[in-house]
Amino acid sequence: MTTINQLYSRLISAMGVEDLEIPMTAVKFYKKEDEIPGPVKENQPTISLTSCQAAKQASLGDAALLTTDNIGCVAAAITFGLVDKDQTEPLGDSRVYTDIMRDQSGLGDDFKPPSPKDFTEGNVYACKDSGNMDFALFGKEDVGRFKDVETAKKAMKDMMAIQPPTTKGVFLYSRDFDDIDIIPDVIVLSVTSAELTRIIQAYQFNTGERVTASMGGLRVVNSDLIVRPYLTGKINVAPYCLGARLIAEFEADRMGIGMPFSIFEEL
């Protein structure tokens, strides 16, 4: 049994609820200078996946190595440090998130996907104010996720990201992945409010420390639940965002809690 499976089993046993299962995703970052193990490379998707899709699929037993070649969300590519936030070239022709834009734009082959810089400058999230309705997700009536470009840029300043980019790949995998015993950097649990209460109680029992949640309405899986715990070394709690609900189909009664592996070990 792998290390994370042992720790997960201990957590579930401590909950004392018969047949309880809490969806869990383990996350491992590989930097540009790292050698990615063969069994991990074997789980590199040949189609694009958003980070929230990869996280959801991992919680169901799958695994996915996300790289610049297959990540389906430009925002997540920025957050994970796979690309520079000011890159002016689009990631590629077909990505899950930008394909939605292409479909609603009606432009077909004439559609040009937004670049990382378009996201950084607020042109995507404030598509109406920036005059870029091609970047809308919900047709002509879509005003974007923020009222104007300045508000979008302000919000993005608080969305933690690994910048400048230093990441070669991000591996999201299930507790059942046992080709090799990988120690993850971050653990994400998809919890009900009652399960969240028990986990916070367990953390406080050992540390006496309160948990402060920092959350936004976008980039919740990649930024709030994965990169924020990775960079701060602290737990974070956040509800799943629009993309996670619509694209990855996270359940309405669940939210996420992300934590460094070192904290998960002590629960």
Spans of features found by a protein language model:
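Acidic, serine/proline-rich low-complexity intrinsically disordered regions
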Residues: 4-267
